[in-house]
Amino acid sequence: MWRRVALLSPMISSSSRSLKLSQAASGLKVGESFATDIISQEERVSPPKEKAPFITFVLGGPGSGKGTQCEKIVETFGLQHLSAGDLLRREIAMHTENGAMILNLIKDGKIVPSEVTVKLIQKELESSDNRKFLIDGFPRTEENRVAFERIIRADPDVVLFFDCPEEEMVKRVLNRNQGRIDDNITTMKKRLKIFNALNRPVIDYYKNKGKLYTINAVGTVDDIFQHVLPIFNSFEQLKESSHVNPQSHLGSSLVENSS
């Protein structure tokens, strides 16, 4: 029996040496083969990284026509439309603790903290199956912008600014409201003054980052939209859902990119 073991020992030793040589030839140390198999299996089953959402901010003064253009963008490219104001109103209507706090702030004439608004936006971004978003009328202030970057940890892909002369915006709002002209003019001038004071730093910030597209918002709805289309057609992730000709050309007189 001992002789049989002695005879087998060289064979076992030889097999071991062969295994070592085979693994060495393939760049593996003894014992690494099994671990490598496990790693490769884990790589195969690990889920792919989730794509970052496509985010568009839409800015413009009261009467600039941005709301109408938002509707056409959503319809054409399949983006999900988010409005900070709508989200706040919905939270109030749901009678949540957060909604009660928002309502009390508004009743007291206080500004809703940026963090509250951004977290409502974050909730929509995370719960939606859509990965393309159009955020209307946001950010209104530098504080909004900073809070968005800090909480969401993302930059917008596109920032649209519908630039419209003050006289045209006043005329549009007065025609729309059909109320007392003196009161409306006074209110409009106050709103425009606030918009310019708060929004201008945001607009300048994104202009310096090369993300701002300034649209001349004078003209018919369809004419203006024809100069919005090429901006979105230039992004591959939007072409699949686009219902327009991707060869549309940009009218240089109506749109300006700050990049």
From Swiss-Prot:
Residues annotated as binding a ribonucleoside 5'-phosphate are R89, K110, I111, V112, G137, F138, P139, R140, R180, R191
Per its Swiss-Prot or TrEMBL entry, what cofactor is needed?
A: Mg(2+)
Region (LID), start-end ranges: 175-183
Listed under GO cellular component are: cytosol; nucleus
Residues annotated for CMP binding in this entry: N144
The reactions it catalyses are: CMP + ATP = CDP + ADP; dCMP + ATP = dCDP + ADP; UMP + ATP = UDP + ADP
Q: Which residues form the signal peptide?
A: none
According to the record, cofactor stoichiometry and binding are noted as: Binds 1 Mg(2+) ion per monomer.
Q: Which CDD domains does this one have?
A: ADK
Q: Could you name the domain of life of the organism this protein comes from?
A: Eukaryota
Tell me which EC number(s) this protein carries: 2.7.4.14
Which cysteines bridge via disulfide bonds? none
Note what the entry says on domains. Consists of three domains, a large central CORE domain and two small peripheral domains, NMPbind and LID, which undergo movements during catalysis. The LID domain closes over the site of phosphoryl transfer upon ATP binding. Assembling and dissambling the active center during each catalytic cycle provides an effective means to prevent ATP hydrolysis.
Q: Which NCBIfam families match?
A: UMP_CMP_kin_fam
Q: How does it assemble?
A: Monomer.
Q: Name the chain's protein.
A: Probable UMP-CMP kinase 2
- Native source organism of the sequence: Arabidopsis thaliana
